Amino acid sequence: MLSITLSEVLNQMNLKMPSDEGVLNFELTGFSSLDQAGPHDVSFWTGDKVSETGLAGNAGGVSASAFAYVHAGLLFVPSLYEKYCIDGRSELLPNVRFVCPVENPYHAMVTFMREFVERRETFDGPRIASSAQVHASAVVEGVVGENAVIGPNCVVMKGAVIGAGTVLEANVTVYPRVTIGEDCVFQAGVVVGPRGFGFYEFEGKRRMVPHLAGVRIGNRCSFSANDVVAAGFISPTVIGDDCHFDTFVQIAHNCVLGNNIFFASQSGVAGSVTVEDDVEFAGGVQSAGHLTIGKGVKVAAKAGVTKSLKAGKVYAGYPAEEIDVWRRSVVKLRMMGKK
């Protein structure tokens, strides 16, 4: 858990200090995305870099009225919004303790994560329940619950939590900031919580995004051999209850999966995809990032999802479309090919 003051952050990042010294000792204890941030969290908003809408109007998918519900301890915003801020406060963001205009809010957030999370965050020492079974070759630095089984050559890093009755079979790696629920099964080679594949541009250079928000997995989930679940940036990658994944499945950073989801072998989702309850992916299905897969959707094998899918439908093909439309298209193409 973090415990830092606003003064420490502003000093370390060479940011403008407020004239109100009383706010400098305000405690910051976490970080999160704008929609989930709490009163002591650090977050950011990129705004509209072209015009001065956004805080004063509508930009970046956020309306002015929505900002009334934003809670944060420290919020990085674009420097062009400095005119709306007086000594770290803004009437447009009444529930944000300190609004901090910066040149590049995304880079500021990355800098904060590297300086205060990656380098300073501490975790409690290992704690293994008396009923847990841990193989002699395993390395456990995190928390292991009652009746859990940690198999040969598994690694449970500091800050990881393994729930009661969960089984890591062999060569499973669980990174820091990962919480796994009860009665889950992880086959050989599964990796949970590594840095995702994310980059951003700043000052003419492409830079890596630190994914330090970890992963949260619910109860009764199963992961087959060599699956990978990447950590989120400032909000965790989330998988609900009763989800089951075949071999070689990839769940990218910042994805949010609901309950009762089934992915067959070699399927996967790119970053920031929302998968609602009861979704099924057949083998080899791949989804582009920043989409929503609606409740109860089924996607046929080898399909490529390039846009959000409506709930309750069956899809196929590339780009994925409703399966009846896809079938008619395939028939027409075959008929044209015979002429």
What are these regions (language model features)?
Residues 44, 127-322:
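Structural signal for interior beta-strand "rungs" in well-ordered beta-sheet cores
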Residues 1-131, 183, 189-190, 194-208, ...:
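Terminal amphipathic alpha-helical/low-complexity segments used for targeting or macromolecular assembly
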